[in-house]
């Protein structure tokens, strides 16, 4: 794997932690690590494309990298990232697909899933998420939860809040499965902090559910968490509207 593979595909643990609060559809954030690199390990014909990308000249980066995209994975990656940084997702998708053909990783499958959503192709995105899960089952290269959070973030950014509900419930049930809500434990597994999950999930629930359905939705976790988590959950539910009369 070349320089761009190292720069823009975070190590599994790093990616999992970062993905708990950010979405990989923001390619500019992924590229941030590149700015300080010296003596880049990249094909010489891509040096100008990388320099342009680092300087934020995305059109120039694409012009320099595109002629090599069929041959070099890093060229396809550069084009995909540059188009994504400009929010030109339909143009980014073919390059993510070309990259996946060369590097069929779970990470790249998630990129195809989130990019599909940003193109308005939710069903295609769901299929790529399934593919990512299948690959990750064998490779264990990333956190399944972090990947799912990225997909939810893409759905939220594209205004597909109702489609995010099943995935949100999946993440909710992870807390009930692991039972532990200690921040370090969650961080090391790419699971969002429990407080962050409560806050971010409410935005989706308010937009898609009747008020009297929100408390029962969170109530699915009652009795399934550690002591700290149960206390946090009770406090959260207690301040929500739609409480039953005492």
Regions found by a protein language model. Name each.
Residues 2-28, 157-246:
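Eukaryotic alpha-helical solenoid repeat scaffolds
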Residues 40, 71, 78, 104, ...:
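Structural signature of alpha-solenoid helical repeat junctions
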Residues 43, 47, 78, 111, ...:
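"A position-specific structural signal for the A-helix of alpha-solenoid helical repeats
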């Amino acid at each position: 794997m070349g320089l761009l593979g190292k720069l823009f595909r975070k190590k599994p643990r790093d990616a999992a932690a970062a993905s708990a609060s950010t979405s990989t559809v923001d390619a500019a954030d992924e590229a941030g690590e590149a700015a300080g690199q010296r003596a880049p390990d990249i094909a010489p014909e891509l040096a100008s494309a990388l320099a342009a990308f680092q300087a934020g000249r995305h059109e120039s980066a694409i012009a320099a990298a595109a002629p090599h995209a069929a041959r070099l994975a890093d060229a396809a990656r550069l084009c995909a990232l540059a188009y994504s940084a400009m929010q030109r997702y339909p143009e980014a998708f073919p390059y993510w697909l070309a990259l996946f053909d060369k590097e069929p990783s779970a990470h790249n499958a998630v990129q195809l899933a989130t990019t599909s959503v940003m193109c308005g192709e939710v069903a295609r995105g769901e299929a790529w998420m399934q593919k990512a899960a299948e690959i990750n089952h064998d490779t264990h290269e990333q956190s399944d939860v972090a990947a799912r959070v990225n997909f939810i973030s893409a759905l939220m950014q594209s205004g597909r809040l109702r489609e995010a509900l099943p995935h949100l419930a999946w993440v909710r049930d992870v807390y009930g499965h692991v039972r532990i809500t200690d921040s370090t434990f969650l961080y090391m597994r790419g699971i969002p902090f429990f407080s962050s999950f409560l806050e971010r999930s409410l935005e989706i629930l308010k937009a898609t559910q009747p008020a009297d359905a929100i408390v029962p939705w969170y109530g699915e976790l009652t009795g399934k968490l550690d002591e700290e988590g149960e206390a946090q959950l009770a406090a959260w539910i207690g301040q929500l509207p739609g409480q039953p009369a005492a």
